[in-house]
UniProtKB/Swiss-Prot annotation:
Assembly: Homotrimer.
The protein's name: Acyl-[acyl-carrier-protein]--UDP-N-acetylglucosamine O-acyltransferase
Subcellular location: Cytoplasm
Gene assigned in the entry: lpxA
Major localization class: cytoplasm
Lineage of producing organism: Bacteria, Pseudomonadati, Pseudomonadota, Betaproteobacteria, Burkholderiales
Entry keywords, A to Z: Acyltransferase, Cytoplasm, Lipid A biosynthesis, Lipid biosynthesis, Lipid metabolism, Repeat, Transferase
Organism: Cupriavidus metallidurans (strain ATCC 43123 / DSM 2839 / NBRC 102507 / CH34)
Role played: Involved in the biosynthesis of lipid A, a phosphorylated glycolipid that anchors the lipopolysaccharide to the outer membrane of the cell.
Enzyme class, spelled out: transferase
Gene Ontology biological process terms from the UniProt entry: lipid A biosynthetic process
Amino acid sequence: MTQIHSTALVDPKAELADDVTVGPFSIVGPNVRIGSGTRIGSHTTVEGHTTIGAGNRIGPYASVGGVPQDMKYANEPTQLVIGDRNTIREFTTIHTGTVQDRGVTSLGNDNWIMAYVHIAHDCSVGNHTVFSSNAQIAGHVEVGDWAILGGMSGVHQYVRIGAHAMLGGASALVQDVPPFVIAASDKNGNKATPHGINVEGLRRRGFDAGQIAALRQAYKLLYKSDLSFDDARAEITAMLGQVDATTAVPLQAFVEFLAATQRGIVR
């Protein structure tokens, strides 16, 4: 059965599954829906048009579904949608979307969101990501499945971080990180620069030697050759016809990401 602490304030219009837990001094607003087995910690606010799936752990002291920090926002009924089995730790803030974009901020399944993280309006976060403490992403950012953001990293609005990519701690990211790539600050400052393929992460997730070798070759063409961006992309695309179907899968994702970039890729 639902367990709501006597000091919590849950609006009668909120929709809570039978086994949701709401901790002391927490607030749940009228347009909130919370799925089975989700636990809301103490002193946590869940507001706005927010839908939360099953098996999540949120708080304490988190703020979920707050209005976007966008001066154009005019109280439109924009949304936040959170999937299943996410851990959202203390003092995290996640805001709803804006009508200037899709009107939805989304967080998938099985994500690990550590303390003091900020996920701004209109962001799209996939599945199995890790946001280390104090990682901050601005509005309209896209984060692919299995990506990792290091502690105290900052991401500029509209940037995309590809699947299985990794952003180092205390890094400032202003352009896209292709999938499977590590980007981190270096001795010259906090600006993120490319540091190779996330080989260890890919091995842990079951990528085979052929797939990793192909991605390393693609990285060399993109970052270590004298080719222009367009010529490197063409060479990587040509590789698709030279490898087997299994090896081509991550390579295809790499090519498609490059083709879709609007801000350019991290350099």
